Design a protein with these regions (language model features):
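C-terminal regulatory/interaction regions
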Residues: 260-288
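Divalent metal-coordination and catalytic microenvironments
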Residues: 46, 60, 70, 101, ...
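Boundary at the C-terminal end of the N-terminal hydrophobic targeting segment
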Residues: 23-25
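Conserved beta-strand hairpin/beta-sheet module of binuclear metal-dependent hydrolase folds
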Residues: 33-87, 176-197
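Metallo-beta-lactamase
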Residues: 66, 73-75, 145, 154-156, ...
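Bacterial N-terminal signal peptides that target proteins for export
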Residues: 1-11
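Bacterial N-terminal signal peptides
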Residues: 9-21
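Active-site HxH/HxHxD metal-binding segment of metal-dependent hydrolases
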Residues: 75-78, 85-154, 266
């Protein structure tokens, strides 16, 4: 595990550790740390956290190369590089780039990171390809796609096998990733949740996304079928990585990232929000 001893890192950890409980985290967004560096560290097995304070990126390592999930903003790429290098790894050893969904805070820097890696393969869920290609790159780069994924397809590198699950709603191609890792002689199921249901989401009468309510309902149903040991996500407020990292740094056992109850609470809260939003918006649909 790589832990920063700098005062800045300690202040960041202390500040983020007071994030809301998992039962409420889904609806409380804190974007103040999106562009702030956070100590890279081992989560479990061959899974490492290399994101910022509230935008989460994950590295799955192997002797054959690494898989990166989420590149985030172009302006946060220096933080990503530093996070990877502090683990004793190289950007050029990243062979595959994946994403949670086609929003700039998770995939804007994909073209830039592909160049830095020397040509890592970029893979995107089919339904998100149009939105991903339309992402504005501040540096003017064209977003690349080397492989288009379908629901249930697997991405393999070395001994790592990641399965892409279509969980639409946040975007049409919102992708939840699952895998199994080994740690301490045991197997652990890992899930990286794609995106949550915002408390101000327009589910009824959404002209830009007419299927959004049904898509979220389908995704909630699918999320209920998963039983992960390790719950990760694209945003920090879903699962409190700062608090878990702080406890992990102090030698807490079992590993604080083992949190099946936190995952179940997140799914239950999403379903509760969906029911409330649909009921409320049916009473007052948007004006034509």
């Amino acid at each position: 595990m790589v832990a920063s001893n700098t005062l800045r890192a300690l202040m960041l950890i202390a500040g983020l550790a007071v994030m809301p409980s998992l039962a409420l985290a889904q609806t409380v967004e804190d974007r103040t740390q999106d562009r702030v560096a956070f100590p890279s560290h081992k989560v479990i097995g061959n899974v490492y956290s290399v994101g910022t304070g509230t935008l989460n990126s994950f590295l799955f390592t192997s002797p054959e190369g690494h898989i990166l999930v989420n590149t985030n903003f172009e302006e946060t790429v220096p933080h990503l590089r530093e996070a990877v290098e502090k683990l004793g790894l190289k950007m050029t050893d990243i062979k595959i780039i994946l994403g949670s969904h086609a929003h700039g805070d998770h995939m804007q820097a994909t073209a830039m990171v592909k160049e830095m890696t020397g040509g890592a393969q970029v893979m995107v869920m089919e339904q998100d390809v149009p939105a991903y290609k339309a992402l504005k790159s501040p540096s003017g780069k064209v977003q690349p796609v080397d492989r288009v994924l379908k629901d249930g397809e697997q991405v393999r590198l070395g001994g790592t096998v990641l399965t892409a699950h279509l969980t639409p709603g946040h975007t049409r191609g919102c992708t939840t990733w699952t895998t199994t890792v080994q740690d301490g002689g045991r197997s652990y199921s890992v899930l990286i949740a794609c995106g949550g249901l915002q408390e101000d989401a327009r589910l009824v009468g959404n002209k830009n996304y007419p299927e959004i309510a049904d898509h979220f309902a389908q995704s909630i149903k699918k999320y209920k079928t998963f039983k992960p040991d390790i719950f990760l996500a694209s945003h920090a407020w879903f699962y409190d990585p700062a608090g878990k990292y702080q406890r992990l740094s102090k030698g807490a056992t079992p590993n604080p990232y083992i949190d099946p109850a936190g995952y179940q609470a997140w799914v239950a809260n999403m379903e509760k929000n969906w029911n409330s939003l649909v009921a409320e918006q049916k009473k007052s649909p948007p004006a034509n």
